[in-house]
A protein has these predicted regions:
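Noncatalytic carbohydrate-binding groove/subsite architecture in carbohydrate-active enzymes
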Residues: 1-64, 74
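Short beta-strand segments
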Residues: 12, 44, 80, 145-148
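Flexible, active-site-proximal loop/turn residues at the rims of small-molecule/cofactor binding pockets
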Residues: 17, 85, 197
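Flexible loop/turn segments at secondary-structure boundaries
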Residues: 19-21, 50-54, 87-91, 152-154, ...
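Aromatic/acidic polysaccharide-binding cleft in carbohydrate-active enzymes
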Residues: 47-132, 139
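Carbohydrate-binding surface patches
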Residues: 127-162, 188
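Solvent-exposed beta-hairpin/edge-strand motifs
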Residues: 159-174
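C-terminal beta-strand-rich structural cap/linker in extracellular carbohydrate-active enzymes
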Residues: 177-199
């Protein structure tokens, strides 16, 4: 294609795999596009949804949130969750088709939106397997989202330039409900921290 001057605006692909494999796919797509001279072509995962069979559970919420957190620092240009429809579909993972109430994964999108609204990504160091974290800030208003996609609780050690002024938990029973900051992040859960950053 490149030899014949055929343009490639974007390359799209799907993934219903776990987070580590989806990140490998994203890296491979970018690597191959660059290798063959399509460095300006966008790469998009235009369908993703981890473990669809778990929809409506705290585990699915943790996996969905963890995927978004991981994708933020991947070579992807865009990604589309499949899907958010309200109705009968095995892929419809944000709303219960029987009650119209949001499934837990919906609240992971709300948490990610709070990161987006802050506007500036902050550095986060997280080297624990199956745990994903992302932070953002706007002036002195900081927000940290941590997803534990593993089967065990993980001790929590947070060092921030400021003070934690709020904590919320997302799991199978708590839908971003206020909580005390725990000593460990429960298995299959998402923890959200609001931070007052020191000037």
């Amino acid at each position: 294609m490149k030899e014949n001057g055929v343009p490639l605006d974007y390359f799209s692909w799907h993934s219903y795999a776990n987070i580590p494999n989806t990140m490998k796919f994203a890296a491979y797509a970018r690597e191959q596009l660059d290798k063959y001279g399509f460095t300006d072509a966008e790469t998009t995962c235009n369908e993703w949804n981890p473990e669809v069979s778990l929809r409506g559970t705290g585990r699915h919420a943790a996996l969905t949130t963890g995927m978004m957190l991981a994708m933020q620092n991947s070579p992807l240009d865009s990604a589309m969750f499949y899907d958010a429809r309200y109705g009968t579909s095995i892929y419809g993972s944000l709303f219960n088709p029987l009650t119209a109430e949001p499934f837990p994964a919906y609240y992971g999108f709300l948490a990610f939106n709070e990161l987006y609204k802050r506007g500036t990504q902050a550095e986060v160091v997280c080297d624990v397997q199956n745990v994903y974290a992302l932070a953002a800030y706007n002036g002195t208003d900081g927000y940290l989202v941590i997803a534990n996609t593993g089967a065990d609780a993980v001790p929590l050690k947070i060092e921030v330039n400021g003070n934690v002024i709020g904590c919320q938990l997302l799991d199978g029973e708590h839908l971003l409900e206020a909580c005390e900051q725990p000593d460990a992040i429960p298995a299959n859960s998402v923890l959200v921290l609001r931070i007052q950053i020191e000037a």
